[in-house]
């Protein structure tokens, strides 16, 4: 997840699960301050869920600058900028909603859960109209709630910062910045 090529998820289902079983689904969003972590963290044991009759899904999303860069040039290209990591999460949750039946899961019984930054992500998904109907319950562990970190801000507040980052990398254009290795 320290790379843009990180959009993978893991599905943990009982060996006996079949399409149509309608098992409950738990989607876990990892923490890590939006700069680290991954969907296969050892402290969160996805393979245990199937022993309890639950289908577990863990996901990865873009982190750090790859996930949260905010530039006017990107807004001109795509119509929005910033929060790509949250968009990745939403896309993964939508994939689960659309495909979990094939694993024996119930698309109408999805709980999202996050720890730390994952909990803050869960809070944002609960508030976003873009995720309406994608899940039915939410668990926020060690994060979420009201926080200065989660106070909405306009993208324009971050443009100067990201332009300074570009300049620090010796870049004057978005094309030059895209050519810089993330390493």
Q: PLM features: residue spans?
A:
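Serine-hydrolase-like catalytic core of hydrolytic proteins
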Residues: 1-174
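Short, Lys/Arg-enriched alpha-helical recognition elements, typified by the DNA-recognition helix
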Residues: 180-181
């Amino acid at each position: 997840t320290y790379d843009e090529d990180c959009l993978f998820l893991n599905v943990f289902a009982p060996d006996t699960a079949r399409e149509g079983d309608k098992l409950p689904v738990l989607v876990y969003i990892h923490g890590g301050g939006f700069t680290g972590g991954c969907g296969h963290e050892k402290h969160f044991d996805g393979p245990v869920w199937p022993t309890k009759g639950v289908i577990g899904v863990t996901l990865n999303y873009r982190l750090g600058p790859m996930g949260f860069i905010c530039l006017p040039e990107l807004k001109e290209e795509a119509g929005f900028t910033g929060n790509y990591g949250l968009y990745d999460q939403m896309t993964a949750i939508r994939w689960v909603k659309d495909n979990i039946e094939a694993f024996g899961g119930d698309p109408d019984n999805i709980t999202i859960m996050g720890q730390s930054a994952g909990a803050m992500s869960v809070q944002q998904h609960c508030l976003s109209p873009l995720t309406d109907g994608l899940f039915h319950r939410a668990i926020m562990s060690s994060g979420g709630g009201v926080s200065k970190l989660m106070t909405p801000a306009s993208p324009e507040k971050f443009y100067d910062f990201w332009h300074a980052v570009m300049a620090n990398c010796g870049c004057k254009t978005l094309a030059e910045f895209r050519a810089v290795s993330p390493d």
